[in-house]
Curated annotation (Swiss-Prot):
GO biological process: translation
Functional note: This is one of the proteins that bind and probably mediate the attachment of the 5S RNA into the large ribosomal subunit, where it forms part of the central protuberance.
Record's GO cellular component terms: cytosolic large ribosomal subunit
Upper taxonomic lineage: Bacteria, Pseudomonadati, Pseudomonadota, Gammaproteobacteria, Chromatiales
HAMAP family per the UniProt record, alphabetical: Ribosomal_uL18_B (MF_01337_B)
InterPro entries: Ribosomal_uL18_bac-type, Ribosomal_uL18_bac/euk
Key words of the record: Ribonucleoprotein, Ribosomal protein, RNA-binding, rRNA-binding
Summary of subunit composition and partner proteins: Part of the 50S ribosomal subunit; part of the 5S rRNA/L5/L18/L25 subcomplex. Contacts the 5S and 23S rRNAs.
Keyword Disulfide bond set for record: no
Membership in a protein family: Belongs to the universal ribosomal protein uL18 family.
GO MF term set: 5S rRNA binding; structural constituent of ribosome
Protein name (database record): Large ribosomal subunit protein uL18
Length: 117
């Protein structure tokens, strides 16, 4: 198995466990250049809020888009948007990525901004 296939296998297992909880899911995706985060409804059918480093206002604020400071901005932004949408408690879906570096920074920033997981 290659690296992507093993990551996707880990993600599938985690998502199955999160689906049993019936809570909103904070899904994170990272590429070498960007970070993406979205909050998905418990039924898995729709995205309630999203934030990423692709957004114009976030690109202008951060020094680059593929680093920890940009990931922290995405974490703060997704938490603010989630609270505005009435979501305070989520399950963290790291999409099979290691809980380290940018993924951990995004999660910590979202927690500091008031999201509970």
């Amino acid at each position: 198995m290659d690296k992507k296939a093993t990551r996707l296998r880990r993600a599938r297992r985690a998502r199955a466990k999160i689906a049993e909880l019936k809570v909103h899911r904070l899904s994170v995706h990272r590429t070498p250049r960007h970070m993406y985060a979205q909050i998905i409804a418990p039924d898995g059918g729709r995205t309630l809020v999203a934030a990423s480093t692709v957004e114009k206002d976030l690109r202008s604020r951060a020094e680059g888009t593929g680093n920890c400071s940009a990931a922290a901005e995405v974490g703060r932004l997704i938490a603010e948007r989630a609270k505005a949408a009435g979501v305070e408690r989520v399950a963290f879906d790291r999409s099979g990525f290691k809980y380290h570096g940018r993924v951990k920074t995004l999660a910590d920033a979202a927690r500091e901004a008031g999201l509970q997981f």
